[in-house]
Amino acid sequence: MTSGKKTIKDEIIEFAKGRYYFRFDELRQSLVNQHSGLSNDTLKKTLYLLKKAGGIFDAGRGWYSTIAQECRLDKAPVQEMEQLIKRSFPFLDFRCWSTLQLRDYFHHMPNWFVSFVYSDIDSLQAVKDLLTDHNYNTYLNPLKQEARKFIELREKTVILRPLVVYRSARSMPALEPEKAIVDLYLETELTNLLDREEYRRLFLALIRSCRINVAAMLDYARNRKVSDPIRNIIEEVNSTKAP
């Protein structure tokens, strides 16, 4: 099926050009205006071939991207702490990350970086005691008023929070950047680690420079009840042209 000399493949490439991310439904609507008989199967098959050729990349359920490099967090900043917790509590379900892992995306580099540990609420005190005994500056699930008054940011600062169960366990390891960005938004509200504009700039810098799983991020944001602000920033990316 063609439009003039252009194939469906050509039109998808043209549609994707200049976009960091796009939705399947958005693409289909654009093409259906010119090809009333275009089926979802034909469109999906063409997208599959473009992905296989490396021109377009998967960005989660119903989302695509023109960014080849997938977002990954450097594990080094939390490796020592992670190993300490694993040695002491080998059967504990937990995860951790640090703002240091996002250092390449800050517009203004913070004076101190903060690490976060998430685990079962009944286990947090034991983890806090362990980290405190190893010279970490720890805070156990501080609420907004407490956090803004009493948290002292310095080297090896760790905030411990209850682990939010998200979908299946097997989906967790691959979603660390997406989760960290959503969790950081919540921390801007609770701890005032950075203001809204700095957060927005960091978010934009990250998702323009490497590819995220947009669908997974939106699912997690919905689970954490912050889907609107996260979606708004993603839509801002969609409204700007990629180089």
Regions found by a protein language model. Give the residues of each.
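Short, Lys/Arg-enriched, disordered terminal segments
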Residues: 1-7, 242-243
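Short beta-edge/loop segments at beta->alpha junctions of small alpha/beta modules
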Residues: 2, 15-91
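Short, charged/polar micro-motifs that form catalytic or ligand-binding hotspots
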Residues: 17, 36, 117, 167, ...
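Short, well-structured alpha-helical interface segments that form or flank functional binding sites
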Residues: 22, 42-45, 122, 126, ...
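Short gly/ser-rich loop at a beta-strand->alpha-helix junction or flexible surface loop bordering the NTP-binding
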Residues: 62, 78-154
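Hydrophobic alpha-helical interaction segments
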Residues: 139-243
